[in-house]
């Protein structure tokens, strides 16, 4: 779904752009022809938006995909296609524990992880937006497989917001919601389901097992 926060602009104006991202979500939504989930707010947003029905990911895992989004490059062309690289790529800092600071190989040996060093010519597209006058904010996930340069964002963090820009300055603002992230799957396991699992259509590559 593509939605501009300024629907009617002249050719001489720079539109404000609000970019909302969610994670680990499939196109099982009504705007794509699926009626499993009831999502009236998303339906309303979709009715006012341009919907892409023929778009495909460059790689089927989060961080390499995110590196592609922020640079406009194929991950294999800039070395960000391996999942996962170093601890320094995380927006929440470099915490020291095996899940992030080291990888464990098949022999049980600890292998220090690394941050990809992209070619000098590769830039985050927000660097171009900032150069053209945009106020760019990210709230708040980066995780690009490489450390985001300081020139990528005017603000990057949990408090980042377009409201801090100069008067009449156009903005590009990202808000990342992780409520659909796979890691949140079990947070509500004791609550009633909102969808009957028996009514969820299975794609042909998912076997319909007894469990």
Where do the PLM segments sit?
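Short alpha-helical segments and helix-capping/turn motifs at coil-helix boundaries
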Residues: 122-123, 154-163
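Hydrophobic alpha-helical packing residues
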Residues: 45, 126-129
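Short, well-structured beta-strand/strand-turn elements
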Residues: 132-146
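Bacterial Sec-dependent N-terminal signal peptides
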Residues: 1-15
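Active-site segment of extracytoplasmic enzymes that catalyze sulfate/phosphate-ester chemistry
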Residues: 19, 26-120, 134
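Loop/turn elements at helix/coil->beta-strand transitions in domains of secreted/extracellular proteins
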Residues: 13-18, 48-53, 130-136, 168-172
């Amino acid at each position: 779904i593509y939605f501009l926060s300024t629907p009617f602009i002249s050719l001489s104006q720079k539109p404000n752009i609000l970019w909302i991202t969610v994670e680990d979500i499939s196109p099982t939504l009504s705007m794509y022809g699926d009626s499993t989930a009831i999502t009236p707010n998303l339906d309303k947003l979709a009715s006012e938006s341009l919907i892409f029905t023929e778009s495909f990911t460059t790689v089927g895992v989060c961080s390499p995909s995110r590196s592609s989004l922020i640079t406009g490059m194929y991950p294999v062309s800039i070395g960000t296609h391996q999942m996962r690289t170093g601890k320094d790529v995380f927006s929440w800092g470099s915490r020291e524990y095996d899940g992030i600071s080291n990888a464990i190989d098949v022999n049980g040996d600890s292998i220090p992880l690394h941050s990809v060093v992209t070619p000098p010519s590769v830039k985050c597209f927000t660097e171009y937006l900032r150069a053209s006058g945009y106020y760019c904010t990210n709230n708040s996930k980066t995780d690009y497989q490489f450390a985001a340069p300081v020139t990528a964002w005017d603000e990057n963090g949990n408090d980042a917001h377009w409201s801090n820009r100069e008067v009449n300055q156009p903005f590009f603002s990202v808000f990342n919601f992780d409520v659909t992230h796979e890691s949140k799957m079990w947070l509500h396991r004791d609550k009633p389901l909102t969808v009957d699992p028996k009514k969820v259509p299975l794609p042909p590559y998912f076997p319909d097992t007894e469990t």
